[in-house]
Amino acid sequence: MNSVLNSGRTTICDAYNVVAHDPFSFEHKSLDTIQKEWMEWKRTDHSLYVAPVVGTVSSFLLKKVGSLIGKRILSELWGIIFPSGSTNLMQDILRETEQFLNQRLNTDTLARVNAELIGLQANIREFNQQVDNFLNPTQNPVPLSITSSVNTMQQLFLNRLPQFQIQGYQLLLLPLFAQAANMHLSFIRDVILNADEWGISAATLRTYRDYLRNYTRDYSNYCINTYQTAFRGLNTRLHDMLEFRTYMFLNVFEYVSIWSLFKYQSLMVSSGANLYASGSGPQQTQSFTAQNWPFLYSLFQVNSNYILSGISGTRLSITFPNIGGLPGSTTTHSLNSARVNYSGGVSSGLIGATNLNHNFNCSTVLPPLSTPFVRSWLDSGTDREGVATSTNWQTESFQTTLSLRCGASSARGNSNYFPDYFIRNISGVPLVIRNEDLTRPLHYNQIRNIESPSGTPGGARAYLVSVHNRKNNIYAANENGTMIHLAPEDYTGFTISPIHATQVNNQTRTFISEKFGNQGDSLRFEQSNTTARYTLRGNGSSYNLYLRVSSIGNSTIRVTINGRVYTVSNVNTTTNNDGVNDNGARFPDINIGNIVASDNTNVTLDINVTLNSGTPFDLMNIMFVPTNLPPLY
C-alpha cells in the first residue's frame, strides 16, 4: 500500500513484498495493519459495495480462533464494530448492501433497525463494563459471580437478533444479522472460556455450551437458507453471478464458516473458501442460472489442489475496415484459447478454441509459492476515436506479490484484489458453453476442454476467472504439482481443506461440493473404497485428529498416518450431527485419535472411506487439534 498507481483504480500493494515468503503472514499481522489494509482497499481499489469493517472482523475472528489469548472476544469486537460507541460502521454496512442490491428499507423499518443498533451497542458496552467492575472491584462486598449479568445479556441478544430478520428484508439485512450473530456467539464463547474467573456454576456452564452449539446451528442455517433462496432466483451473466456470491461471502459466509470452529482454541484455520472474480464489459458471456452453477463451480474448483504457476493462450488482434468504403475501422484484441498451468507440468483443459497455437505464456516468473498472483484484471470494453474508429479490448492480466504483471494484454479497467487473499487458481469460460458440458460437472482433477458450440460467432474466445483464497501455509509442491501443507512451528493446531489432496483414487466418482459453513468445500466420495492422500510437513507435535464428515448412511473411515491405522465404523450422520444443513451435508466432528506430525518430515495422511450403505460421503474438514484443548462442545 505504499504506492498507488491510478490507472483504472489499480493499486499496487508493496506491503506484500515484505510477507511474500512468509507462509504464516496472516497470523503474524497486527489487527491495526489488517484494519489499515482493508481501509486502503476500500479507498482505492474495488467496485464492490463492501464496507471495510467486514474484512477486518473476519480477520479478527480467524486470528482469535487461532489464539489462546482472546478470552474476551466480545469486548474487542465491540471496539471494532462500534468504535467509541458509534453505530456508523454498521450503518455503512446497511447502506452498502442497499446500493449493491438496489433495495432500501422503508422509513419506519430503517428507524427500527437504527434503534436496535443503538440498543445493541449500549447493551454490550454495559455488559463489558459490568465484567470489568467484577474483575476489578472498587466496593465491598465483592460479588461471587457475574451470572446475573451474563443471563441478562443473553436475553438481550435473543430479543434483538430477530430485528435483523424482518420479513421482506431478509437478504438486505443479512450482513447486519451476521454481525449481530458474530457478537452473540462471541459472547457465549467468552462465557464458556471465562467460567471459572467469572464464577459461573457448572450447571450454567453446561447451559452455555448447549447455547454455543444450538445458536451456531440456528444462525448458520438461517444465513445459508436466505442466501440459497436468493441465489436460486438468479438468471444473469457470469460477472454478476460471481459478484453476488463474492459479496455475500465477504459479508456473511466468512463468518458463518468460522462459527462452527468457535468450539476450538488455538486452531490456525487454513481456509479453502474462495472468492471469484470475472470481467465486466460488453464482450461478455451468456447468461447463467443457478441450475448451471454446479458445472461452473466444478470448473473453477477442479484443480484447486495444485500449485498455480500461470496461464498460456492465443491473443489475436484483427482490424476490419468499415463496410461500404466508409472511413475508419474496428480493431478487436481478444484472448482466443487459454490453458491454466500448474507446478509439476500439470495443465488444465483448453478454454475457448482448441485448434490454435498459443503465442503467449504468463507465469509468476519466480517460484509461485514465493511470489503468487494476488491481483487480476479481467475487464473488456471499447475505445472510440471519433465516430468512425473503435477498438475492442480484453485484458486478462495478472500481478504477483512482487508487482510483476503478465497476461493476454496490458492491465486496465477494474482490478480484483482482496487483502490477505492469494489467487490460488485461474479458470474461465468460452462465450457460450455447450449444453452437454453445462449438465455434466467436472470430477476431481478432470481435464476437459470447454468450448463453444461449433459455428458460434466469437466462440473461440476465452474469458478468465480468478479464484482467491487465504490458503498460504504451503511448504512446497509435490512431484505431481500438488501442495504440501505446512504445520505451524509452535503447538498451534491447524486445518487442511479436504479438496487440497495429494492424490485421490476413484477420481471419476469424486467431486468437490460447495459448502458455506465450513471454511472451504468438501470432497464428495460417490464410490466405496475411495482414498484421499494428503501430505504435510510436520513439526514434531502431537495432536488429536478430528474429521468433519457427512455420511447419510453407514460408512467406515480408516485413517493411516506414520504406519498406524485408525478405524471408525458405523459412521452415520443422518441424526448424529451438529444440526447445520450445509448444502445437503449434515456433519459432526469425529475424533479419530492422537497422532504425531513427525518433525521436519513430509508426513502422508491417507483417509479411506467405505460406503456400507452406498450413499455419498462428504469429507468436509481435517483438523489437527492441540491435545490439551478439547472442543468446547
Curated annotation (Swiss-Prot):
One GO biological process term: symbiont-mediated killing of host cell
MF terms (GO), sorted A to Z: signaling receptor binding; toxin activity
ATP-binding as UniProt keyword: no
Cysteine-cysteine disulfides: none
Keywords, ordered alphabetically: Sporulation, Toxin, Virulence
Pfam family, one: Endotoxin_N
Functional description taken from the UniProt entry: Promotes colloidosmotic lysis by binding to the midgut epithelial cells of both dipteran (Aedes aegypti) and lepidopteran (Manduca sexta) larvae.
Note: Toxic segment of the protein is located in the N-terminus.
Similarity annotation: Belongs to the delta endotoxin family.
Name assigned to this protein: Pesticidal crystal protein Cry2Aa
Organism: Bacillus thuringiensis subsp. kenyae
Gene: cry2Aa
